[in-house]
Amino acid sequence: MKRLLITICGRAGSKGFKNKNLKNFCGKPLVYYSLSAAELFIKKHSELEIDVALNTDSEDLARLVAAEYPEVIYLPRGAELGGDRVPKVEVYKDSFARMETRTGKQYDAMIDLDITSPLRTEQDIENAFAKAQEREDLQIIFSVCEARRNPWFNMFKIVGDHAEMVIESQFTGRQQAPEVYDVNASIYVIRRAFLVDNPDPILWHSKFGVSVMMDTGIIDIDSEHDYLLMEAIAQHLYAHYPEFNACLLYTSPSPRDAHES
C-alpha cells in the first residue's frame, strides 16, 4: 500500500453524552489526540502518500480542527448520514468516495481513527497498518483488546425466566476457553476493495484480522462517568508510559475555551 486516506469521523449529536466530540481531555481538545497520532504516523512514513479528512455534521468540530490542522480536508456530512442508526461503514464509504473524487487519487486503503479514543499511541496505528501490509488477503484490520469476560466461561444471557451460558461449554477454567477479544473501535484499516465493491453494511461480514492494544487505554465514552474515568487512567499512562506521553506532548492546547462545553 502506497496511498492512504486517514479519516476522523464524528457526529454533532450524541444521546449518551452531549457534545462529547467537542470536549477537552486533560486540558486539550479530544479530537486533537487522534490528529496528533495521525501526524506522528505520517511523519514516520514519508514513503507513503497520505491525506487526512474530517467527516462531520458539526461546524464547531470543523472549526476546531481547522484552527490547528488546516491541512485536514473537511467533508460536511449530509443529513442522511447524521443519525445514530446509520451504519458506520456508510460514513466510511461516503468519505472514501468523496475524497477520491475531490483529489483525483485512488487510495489503497483507509485508516479510521475514532475521536473518543485519545489514549491511542502512534505505535498502535503502526501495528494495525503493519498487519494489513503483511496480510493482503484480509479486507479489514480491527483494533481490539483482550476481553475480560468470555462467552464460553463467564457470560450469561436471559432466556425466559432464567439465565443460560451465552455459549454452552464444559470449561471449568477461563484459561481453557478460546481467547476472545473486544473490538474497541479505536482503529480500522480497511482496504479499497471493501469500500468500493462490497455492498454489505456489516464490517465483520468480511475476512478480517485484529491488532491488539492495551486494554486499559480504551473505554467507550458514553457518559460523563466514562469520560472522568478515562482522564484518571490517562494521568497514570502519561506518567508511566512514554509512548502515550508522545501524543500528549505533540497535541496542541485548545485555541478556544468555548470548546470546554
Question: For each predicted feature, which ranges?
Answer:
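Conserved alpha/beta core of the MobA/IspD/sugar-nucleotide pyrophosphorylase nucleotidyltransferase superfamily
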Residues: 181-252
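Short aromatic-hydrophobic micro-motifs that form the base-stacking/packing surface
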Residues: 111-113
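A short, N-terminal amphipathic alpha-helix
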Residues: 30-49
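N-terminal nucleotide-binding beta1-loop-alpha1 segment
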Residues: 1-18
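Single conserved hydrophobic/aromatic residue that forms the stacking wall/gate
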Residues: 250-261
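Conserved core of the sugar-phosphate nucleotidyltransferase
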Residues: 90, 109, 118-207, 211-213
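Short beta-strand/loop segment that forms part of the nucleotide-sugar
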Residues: 49-57
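Short phosphate-binding loop-to-helix
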Residues: 59-109, 127
